[in-house]
């Protein structure tokens, strides 16, 4: 399953997900992007301490689901009613593939990516 709102998913990422699930090692696969940002929750830093503020590159590896690609077995949907298994295969994608259009600002960003990287005159 890919979403029209994630227009830059590559064939290579799709193939990785399909291969992982078809191999039988995983019931599902989905795209993720590494998030190296200072995160806060309930007024407190979530992934660092104020006593030791690291460089963003040194923050712990945290991944965000990109909503760009989901591959799963029919058994997973039928038996558990969901698209992500307990042990999913994570397909790490770059920032361009991770682009997901949910609002006007996202569309402006996607349009700029398209015009910069993919548009042929």
Predicted regions and their residues:
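Conserved core of the sugar-phosphate nucleotidyltransferase
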Residues: 4-94
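Hydrophobic helical membrane-anchoring modules
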Residues: 79, 91-92, 97-121
């Amino acid at each position: 399953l890919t979403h029209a709102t994630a227009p830059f998913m590559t064939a290579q990422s799709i193939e990785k997900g399909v291969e992982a699930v078809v191999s039988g090692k995983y019931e599902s696969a989905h795209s993720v992007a590494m998030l190296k940002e200072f995160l806060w929750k309930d007024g407190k830093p979530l992934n660092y301490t104020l006593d030791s503020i690291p460089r963003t590159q040194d923050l712990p590896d945290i991944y965000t689901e990109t909503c760009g690609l989901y591959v799963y077995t029919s058994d997973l949907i039928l038996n558990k009613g969901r698209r992500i298994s307990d042990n999913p295969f994570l397909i790490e994608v770059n920032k361009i593939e991770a682009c997901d259009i949910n609002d006007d600002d996202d569309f402006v960003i996607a349009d700029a990516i398209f015009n910069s990287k993919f548009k042929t005159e």
